[in-house]
Structure formats: structure tokens, C-alpha cells
Amino acid sequence: MNSLYTAEGVMDKHSLWQRYVPLVRHEALRLQVRLPASVELDDLLQAGGIGLLNAVERYDALQGTAFTTYAVQRIRGAMLDELRSRDWVPRSVRRNAREVAQAIGQLEQELGRNATETEVAERLGIDIADYRQMLLDTNNSQLFSYDEWREEHGDSIELVTDDHQRENPLQQLLDSNLRQRVMEAIETLPEREKLVLTLYYQEELNLKEIGAVLEVGESRVSQLHSQAIKRLRTKLGKL
């Protein structure tokens, strides 16, 4: 780490930039796989580069936050801001996501337990196949919850990444009270949905690998993930 400081003990911003440029590509590739093919990698890289530049310029080691943690916030946030500015998610998909979350919340409040897919589909007035397709569509749009957290809770609650661990938008929240609520809410999820979140965010398995564990296809894993995120949103909204 000494190479990042000048002889006078001042952080060398140029060296910091050079060392962490690969992080921009890493985050861009992780994000791109969850986005429509129309989203270009170069656009994400450009936005992420601006985010890294902001991180280099604004980082204050005295605040006690590791630079990697801070940089990931800035890089990923810049990429999401770019996506948001283009409004790439169709309004119908946003509307469906809200309707699904609302139906789940209403049912679980009425039933006092986790609602089944069939029950949610019936509440929405659609068949199970259409409901599962809706889950797929909304899962592709929600950026695995990061953007949804920012929309609901604002920039005052940031997602953070440990230096040695993949970014985890469900558990690593700066606000300790909210983190505890998230963990408690995850424990109440149906076992398969809880397992999907654990395998993806903690064990770092991809959708294909998770599908092999559950003996289902990737699309089914995506549906389970989408439903789990929506359950968490409704559960956290009641806490």
C-alpha cells in the first residue's frame, strides 16, 4: 500500500487510479450480465470510470472506510445513474414489479405466512405461467435489488463491499439496524428462495450452478430470486 503514497505521505491519486482501474471492468461485467443486450459494455465502463475518478478525488482515509469499499460504491452508483438516465426499463415492467410486490404484501398480511406462487397469480388474475414470466421480466430489470434500495431508501443508505468479498446488496448495509432487519427477513423466506440468495450472494454461484444444486433451469432460479427480492421488500416495509 506504500506505493500509493508520495514521499511526503500524501496519497498518490494517479497510482490509486491505475491500481483500481480493473475494478471498473469487473463491476461492469458483473452488471452487464443482468441487463438487456442493448446495454453496451463500453457505456458501463465509461460511467464506471467517472465513478472511480470521483472516488479517487473525494476519498478520505480518515473516515475509516477502505478505498475498495468506497470505490465500488462510486463505480456502481455511477453505472446505475447512467442506466437510470436512459430509463431502459419499460414502464410496463416497472408497473408489474410494483403490482407483484403489492400482491405479495397484501396476501402475506392476510394469511400470516409466505404466499405461494399460485396464490399470488390468482390475486393478480393471471395464470401461473404468466406470473412466472412476469417474475423473469422484473428480475432482469431490478439489477438484483441495488437500484431498488436506492429508490426506496435514498442515497443516505449505501450498499458497501468488503475488500475480500463480492458485493452483497442484501446483507452489507451501512445502517446496522437495517442490516439486522434484512437478515431477520431473509430467515422468514421459503427455504428454496432463501437458498437461492445464500448460494448467489454468499457462495458466489451463478444461476446455472444454482440451478444444478436445485435441479431446475436457470430461468426458474431467476424467478425464485425475483420473488425472494419482492418478499424482502414487503417484509422490510412492515418493519
Curated annotation (Swiss-Prot):
Substitution effect: Q73A: No change in activity
Gene name linked to the record: fliA
Free-text note regarding domains: The sigma-70 factor domain-2 mediates sequence-specific interaction with the -10 element in promoter DNA, and plays an important role in melting the double-stranded DNA and the formation of the transcription bubble. The sigma-70 factor domain-2 mediates interaction with the RNA polymerase subunits RpoB and RpoC. The sigma-70 factor domain-4 contains a helix-turn-helix (H-T-H) motif that mediates interaction with the -35 element in promoter DNA. The domain also mediates interaction with the RNA polymerase subunit RpoA.
Family of the protein in this entry: Belongs to the sigma-70 factor family. FliA subfamily.
Sigma-70 factor domain-4: annotated segments: 185-233
Protein's recorded name: RNA polymerase sigma factor FliA
DNA-binding region(s), chain positions: 207-226
Main location: cytoplasm
Effect of gene knockout: Mutants have poor biofilms (decrease in biomass, surface coverage and mean thickness).
Role played: Sigma factors are initiation factors that promote the attachment of RNA polymerase to specific initiation sites and are then released. This sigma factor controls the expression of flagella-related genes.
UniProt region (Sigma-70 factor domain-3), positions on chain: 96-166
Domain of life: Bacteria
GO molecular function, one term: DNA-directed RNA polymerase activity
An individual GO BP term: regulation of DNA-templated transcription initiation
Gene Ontology cellular component terms for the protein in this record: cytosol; cytosolic DNA-directed RNA polymerase complex
Keywords recorded for this protein, A-Z: Cytoplasm, DNA-binding, Sigma factor, Transcription, Transcription regulation
Places the protein is found: Cytoplasm
